[in-house]
Amino acid sequence: MIPVVALVGRPNVGKSTLFNRLTRTRDALVADFPGLTRDRKYGRAEVEGHEFIIVDTGGIDGTEDGVETRMAGQSLVAIEEADIVLFMVDARAGLMPADEGIAKHLRSREKTTVLVANKTDGLDPDMVTADFYSLGMGEVYPIAASHGRGVTSLLETVLLPFVQDEIEEPVELSEEEENAAYWAALEADEQASEEEAEDDFNPEDLPIKLAIVGRPNVGKSTLTNRILGEERVVVFDMPGTTRDSIYIPMVRDEREYVLIDTAGVRKRGKVTETVEKFSVIKTLQAIEDANVVLLVIDAREGISDQDLSLLGFILNSGRSLVIVVNKWDGLSQEVREQVKETLDLRLGFIDFARIHFISALHGSGVGNLFESVTEAYACATRRVSTAMLTRIMQMASDDHQPPLVRGRRVKLKYAHAGGYNPPIVVIHGNQVKDLPDSYKRYLMNYYRRSLDVMGTPIRIQFKEGENPFADKRNTLTPNQLRKRKRLMSHIKKGK
């Protein structure tokens, strides 16, 4: 399960600045849900190859009324959902009564909490953080989020211990070693592709994890019940690693599925109303754990910014996608045409996803969903050999040559598979990281057409060897030095 990190503190202590600093590693804010939790932001961060979900809980006003009553219900649940809480304070403003109130609340929750003193740039960190030790939160980590100072140390000390995978240090290679590594990697990948037929892994043997997500009241629960009702299976709760989600096994056409329900299919006595409404964290985790995501959209309300934010998170997660437009029944032909035009306009950038128009209430169109689900899963888990990927890369290069970079043509050497669900193509070559985005999109679309991929995004990664002589000046040989000396002497005599 991807760890969840909540940023907590008074207003204007720099939580949003740190949030942007962390999520910028993925080049954007991943998701923004103004309709569910006002002025809250949710994003994905990557620290040395490990992913985290970052939650900006907004400002908490701990006044004389007490933090317990002044804190928004959604923020309370965000803290409960978090694996780590970064409690941020303002080093320039010093210790405030609100900080003490928030600290008291956090201590009562017994959460893993790290005290972060922001805005220490230009100040003596030891001096400005001394007062905060009285909060009893342990070590104080001074940072300057706006400049990034101290953030790396904070991440390495606080976040990385939550992941167990060891990170290998990069090894510098000489030019000969780099060339040998290219051919060795190519040979190894070709050998691996030949052994694929003997590989014990078969995606068909595993159940397809299907997450049903969307805004409130778009019909997620109705669709879940319709799917289960049609199949007449015994529904039981199977607890999983993603908290606050219910895993429901089912069988359809002799194919096993696991529905990940994010609509709160639980006993009402075990949850509070606030927890029930706060579905952001469990939705994000359900997406991460799923193989295929059904994004449900209300045909009567159209596509909202919240739908696009959720869609952006799905795409960045690399999950297969099927778009479901619900409540299609009862709409006039004119309204249906308008809805389709809006979908084409706002969802034109995801032309790889199938769109289904259904009525979960009456069941029309629901049965056809599973054709697209199985197609998307098959495309996402299909094994493709190194020889095939390299041949497609060469065909794409022949049809449209890579551009010149600093006067030299970018050279694509070979390609191989780097992962599945989503499919990842790794292209090796010289200066490949300098390719413009337009050519990268061209390669991605070329692979999609050539492999006939539907329902899942394709990711392309570029790798190149470092030139060990890039920063070294050429040294003259003894003969060249003598020749240079004679030329300089001749020039001086001529003057």
From Swiss-Prot:
Q: Name one GO molecular function term.
A: GTP binding
Which residues take part in binding GTP 2? 214-221, 261-265, 326-329
UniProt keyword annotation of Nucleotide-binding present: yes
The residues that cross the membrane are none
Q: Which GO terms describe its biological process?
A: ribosome biogenesis
The job of this chain, per UniProt, is described as:
GTPase that plays an essential role in the late steps of ribosome biogenesis.
What is the annotated quaternary arrangement, including any partners? Associates with the 50S ribosomal subunit.
Q: Protein name, please?
A: GTPase Der
The encoding gene = der
